[in-house]
Amino acid sequence: MNLFLKVFLTIFFSISIYAEREIEFSLNSDSIWRGLTQNNGNPTLAMDLNVLLKNGLTTGIWIESCCSESSSYPNREVGFFLGYQKEINDNLNFSLSYIGTNYPNSKIDNYDELGINFSFYDFEISYFKGLNNFPDYYELSYTYKFLSNDLILSYGDFDPYINNNSSNGKNYSVGIDSFQEGFTLGFFYYYFDARSSSNNNDDGFVFSLSKKTSF
């Protein structure tokens, strides 16, 4: 058991009576990360566990059976975050976080980021500062709520990863989350516009089914 997991479990169990805890399981038709497919159009399973303290400190872990685009790719992703979030007023929130993404069978692909997020009314702005030469990422999204649904529009800009120009580009997505009987049904279209060459452009549709529980 690595040091982070020991620390996380210690914090999780020691502060549980003071915290809000939430776990989510999801089934996805593909894993899309910043406009790029991570699983070559194949389904993935994922689990997220999040803990929020009353003082605004927050932490969480996730695992996903993704990233097997080829036999040389890692076959699962495990990550964690530690941060702070603050509700300034009813219409303005911000959060700061340290995020670590790990691939147990391909540690060379591990990366860390610092993230800052502002949400105001139905808009959200996020900036991720890559550490150790990992590229930066920016994203703007808008959510429109109607009935038991969310219409979500997003735009993102991703710097190239090392010398891989195929990841250098912009991405757009439009989708709907529908909340039904405790489950969330998701459907969205994504488009990746590569700066290097139109041959690296990509688009597609993704479906998801998820269940979230607080405890």
Task: Label the predicted regions.
Residues 19-67:
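Short glycine/proline- and aromatic-enriched beta-strand/turn motifs that initiate or cap beta-hairpins
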Residues 21-23, 55-61, 90-96, 121-126, ...:
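Repeated loop/turn-to-beta-strand initiation elements of outer-membrane beta-barrel proteins
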Residues 109-161:
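Detector for outer-membrane/organellar transmembrane beta-barrel domains
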Residues 54-89, 94-108:
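Surface-exposed loop and membrane-interface regions of Gram-negative outer-membrane beta-barrel proteins
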Residues 25-27, 47-53, 61, 80-84, ...:
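Residues on the lipid-exposed face of transmembrane beta-strands in outer-membrane beta-barrel proteins
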Residues 41-45, 74-78, 108-114, 119-121, ...:
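Residues that define the transmembrane beta-barrel architecture of outer-membrane proteins
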Residues 26-32, 62-66, 85, 97-103, ...:
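Outer-membrane beta-barrel pore domains and translocons
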Residues 174, 178-183, 189-191, 200-215:
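Outer-membrane beta-barrel "beta-signal"
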